């Protein structure tokens, strides 16, 4: 289970550029849940993922994953617990290394052992099988550098890499936004399969209302650094994109400060 309790994040604290990115955010997610996250730009979506990954340490509140308080543990300390796939396909892998070497690094994430153990004969066979399952023909290119691949191929491999270290939590930060429609559809189908196979607790940030409804079993909306909409079960079932957009607009209307409040 993931618990975010009264999370506050302030960037540039005490400076003229001070900005509150999260403000008393509360969110509880059951093990194995697949939650889609929507919200306007600046709502705090990526910051929330950063707090879960350990990239961003909250100025207030508590973060619990699997019953462990990880609030002050950084990214390296959470590497075995949390995997993340970013919007930019180039971010999640090293272009100068081969496909096989990238997979080996991912498998060794959070462990003290180096690449030697991760590149054993048994591991190599496993890597090849995992890549072959993508049906992209990359199993015959395991020695190719990652920077020779397309963005979609790299993103598909980033998803596979996210499953290799036994992480409990998968964070997806608009991971199809930079892909063409066909590849985005392929990556989402792959996402659904891997999440189900590995029973990953998943948070997926997306600007696509269609994706927000088609995937997962719960949708939350952030605005002003807080959760302002949370729909699941019967309340979510049957919602159309138009319904969700209307709910989105209503939340913005009723949670945005008035001109008078802004002046104060």
Where are these regions (language model features)?
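Helix-to-loop junction immediately C-terminal to a conserved catalytic motif
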Residues: 53
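H-loop/switch region of ABC-family ATPase nucleotide-binding domains
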Residues: 206-207
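ABC ATPase NBD coupling module
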Residues: 15, 69-83, 91, 113-116, ...
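Conserved beta-strand-loop-alpha-helix hinge in the C-terminal portion
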Residues: 226-250
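A short, flexible loop at the N-terminus of ABC-type nucleotide-binding domains that lies
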Residues: 1, 10-24, 74
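Conserved small/polar residues in nucleotide/adenosyl-binding loops
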Residues: 254-259
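The feature captures the beta-strand-to-loop junction immediately N-terminal to the Walker
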Residues: 38-40
């Amino acid at each position: 289970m993931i618990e975010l309790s009264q999370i506050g994040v302030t960037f540039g604290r005490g400076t003229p550029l001070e900005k509150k990115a999260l403000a008393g955010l509360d969110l509880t997610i059951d093990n194995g849940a697949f939650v889609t996250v929507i919200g306007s730009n600046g709502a705090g979506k990526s910051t929330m993922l950063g707090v879960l990954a350990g990239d961003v340490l909250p100025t207030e509140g508590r973060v619990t994953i699997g019953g462990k308080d990880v609030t002050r543990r950084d990214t390296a300390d959470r590497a075995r617990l949390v995997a993340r796939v970013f919007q930019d396909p180039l971010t999640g892998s090293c272009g100068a290394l081969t496909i096989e070497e990238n997979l080996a690094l991912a498998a060794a994430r959070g462990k003290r052992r180096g690449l030697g153990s991760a590149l054993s004969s048994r591991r190599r066979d496993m890597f090849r099988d995992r890549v072959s399952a993508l049906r992209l023909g990359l199993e015959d290119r395991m020695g190719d550098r990652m920077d020779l691949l397309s963005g979609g191929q790299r993103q598909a491999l980033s998803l596979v890499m996210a499953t290799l270290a036994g992480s409990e939590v998968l964070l997806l930060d608009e991971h199809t936004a930079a892909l063409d429609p066909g590849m985005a559809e392929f990556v989402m189908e792959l996402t659904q399969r891997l999440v189900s196979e590995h029973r990953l607790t998943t948070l997926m940030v997306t600007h696509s209302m269609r994706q927000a409804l088609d995937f997962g079993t719960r949708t939350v909306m952030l605005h002003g650094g807080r959760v302002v909409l949370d729909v699941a079960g019967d309340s979510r079932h049957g919602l159309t994109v138009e319904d969700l957009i209307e709910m989105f607009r209503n939340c913005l209307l009723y949670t945005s400060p008035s001109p008078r409040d802004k002046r104060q």
